[in-house]
């Protein structure tokens, strides 16, 4: 029986990506429909805000960094959390594996063979596509080991270029910060399959160390530094810039209230976001700013939420901020130590929900199912960082988000040279 093309389209566009990936490989006609730009645009318009994602930790180096997973969302239709699907099959026996970065559905790995050979891989774990990144020319295993032990070297940079929701290229970034306002970037491009070196001015390079993790967004890497009032950024797809941007937090300066928690950054709805608590006792408020311009002036930030935390404080005040929801900017995530659970707080309605690791998995505010993976243990190791007695220390990125793509993005690969 021949099925009309219009009916085929209507059926396929309502299926989750997990099913589309399977049907795409079963039938040539279905593959042609699914691969069309029109189908992709229709699918993404129907699934604009329901994507599986994870909260990942930034300290221990394990293959699965996920501490909180969101699955059962409409777009992918996963029955397990995204972190449980990440696996890597090495081409040789290995003795060490580290997850260096996760962004836009791609993962950057550092691997050591049983004889100590260093290897870097970029992959799409959902499709089990992995590509080994060649080392820089003339670099030996000893060179890489020496660099990785340098206190101002970092090999954890991964940025992407997106078009219509699809990753079309990526760059792996190594950096070494010098003491005199200079940073060297070594950049591997999936477009060229080659490395390039950039020497960039960075006035705060003396306060930049290898343990500082970055957040990638729109081709830009963002780093917190030992200077608590600001952070650094560099655009790897935005042209030939010879200097890093320095962005000061919006509550920095003597004219502002002292925030309760140490400053950090997160992402939501395509923007860098900063939120913190202000006030005290019965007047606790959360303020949320969105970064709108990469400059060092007050016009860099837009205050877009200010909400009372009176309802949350009924659980006690022993909590601290974790991340914002990456797709819904009205939802923030807080960890409650006394309740040993994740608090999801809606800034618009002031409604909150408490989710505990000891409870059965259940739906949360975005319609996804919440699952935990040693979250309580991790939060216990980092909670002291948020204590007022630590306010004089550096800012650190302790949690980030890993969001699955909204479409079937394959892993970009360098074109073979003629």
Curated annotation (Swiss-Prot):
Residues 1-42 form the F-box domain. SMART domains: FBOX. It comes from the Eukaryota. It comes from Arabidopsis thaliana (Mouse-ear cress). Pfam families: b-prop_At3g26010-like, F-box. PROSITE patterns: FBOX (PS50181). InterPro entries: At3g26010-like_b-prop, F-box-like_dom_sf, F-box_dom, SCF_F-box_component. This is Putative F-box protein At3g23950. The lineage of its organism: Eukaryota, Viridiplantae, Streptophyta, Embryophyta, Tracheophyta.
